[in-house]
């Protein structure tokens, strides 16, 4: 009911924890943008943002204030607040326990309301460029003509301002950037600096929502990875068969373990692979 009430107000580039939207939808939308830039002889400068301990740093009072801003009834806001309130934790070492500590932040794990709380928190993260979100996975894209000066540093600074206002933090060591385009044009683009003045690492490939994205937007790396995973699991399947495991159980193992490895998000990449890769 809560999602139905506030869904029309959600950022349309948020794909996580919402019925009818998935990692596949998010990936297709992003890759369409990057392929379009490539087709137009433009550059796509992409920032893959990692929030440090994203769910653990969520401040309950900020989430509640944003729920109120969505215009939800007071009774619903109080119910949601009661879900977050009065949570405690303590540490056990051997037979010794620490004192209980009241939690004013962090999202409960294993509950659907946890991811929902995070997308409510991050909904107003709106930069001056295209931003895709899948719960706490955030991808920032800037499209550039070959002679255009990049503004990604400005967008990164906007992101830092948002994290400061919402008591979040960017993990600069895990945040990466990738530029799709010609090598000559990429070399001319200055490095992106973190808030600590360190360079954000520029990579040629990145695992995004379970898919390996390469700078040339080809799928050799991704296919090699999934074939390697599937091969080891098929080897284990053969061992199970030699051990006399019933056929029904072997089939269940294939359907639940091997097939998802090969088919995950296949609408994103399968139509772009070569016939040789398909035969692999």
Predicted feature descriptions by range:
Residues 1-107, 142:
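Conserved pre-catalytic core of RNA-dependent polymerases
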Residues 1-3, 26-37, 149-166, 231:
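Inter-domain linker/hinge segments that demarcate the starts of reverse transcriptase
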Residues 4, 82, 119-123, 256-260, ...:
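Short, residue-level hotspots on alpha-helical faces of the histone-fold
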Residues 14-18, 45-54, 80, 106-114, ...:
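Catalytic palm active-site di-aspartate
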Residues 15-24, 36-41, 52-56, 69-75, ...:
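Conserved, non-catalytic sequence blocks in retroelement Pol enzymes and Pol-derived host proteins
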Residues 54-70, 127, 138-164:
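Catalytic palm subdomain of template-directed nucleic-acid polymerases
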Residues 95, 154, 161, 169-204:
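Short, conserved micro-motifs composed of acidic
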Residues 132, 197-269:
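Basic, alpha-helical interaction scaffolds
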């Amino acid at each position: 009911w809560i999602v139905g009430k506030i869904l029309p107000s959600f950022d349309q580039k948020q794909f996580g924890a919402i019925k009818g939207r998935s990692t596949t939808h998010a990936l297709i939308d992003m890759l369409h943008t990057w392929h379009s830039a490539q087709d137009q002889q433009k550059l796509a400068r992409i920032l893959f943002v990692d929030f440090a301990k994203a769910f653990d740093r969520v401040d309950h009072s900020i989430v509640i204030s944003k729920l109120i801003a969505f215009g939800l009834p007071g009774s619903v806001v109080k119910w949601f607040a009661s879900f977050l309130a009065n949570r405690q934790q303590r540490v056990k070492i051997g037979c010794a326990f620490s004192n209980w500590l009241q939690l004013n932040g962090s999202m409960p794990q294993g509950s659907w309301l946890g991811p929902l709380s995070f997308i409510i928190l991050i909904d107003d993260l709106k930069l001056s460029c295209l931003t895709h979100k899948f719960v706490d996975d955030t991808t920032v894209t800037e499209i550039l003509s070959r002679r255009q000066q990049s503004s990604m540093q400005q967008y990164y600074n906007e992101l830092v301002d948002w994290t400061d206002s919402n008591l979040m933090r960017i993990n600069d060591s895990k945040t990466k950037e990738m530029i799709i385009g010609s090598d000559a044009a990429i070399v001319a683009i200055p490095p992106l600096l973190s808030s600590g003045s360190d360079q954000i690492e520029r990579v040629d490939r990145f695992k995004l929502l379970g898919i390996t994205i390469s700078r040339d937007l080809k799928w050799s790396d991704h296919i090699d990875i999934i074939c390697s995973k599937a091969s080891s699991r098929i080897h284990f399947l053969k061992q199970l068969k030699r051990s006399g495991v019933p056929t029904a159980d072997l089939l269940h193992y294939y359907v639940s373990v091997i097939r998802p490895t090969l088919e995950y998000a296949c609408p994103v990449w399968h139509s772009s692979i070569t016939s040789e890769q398909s035969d692999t």
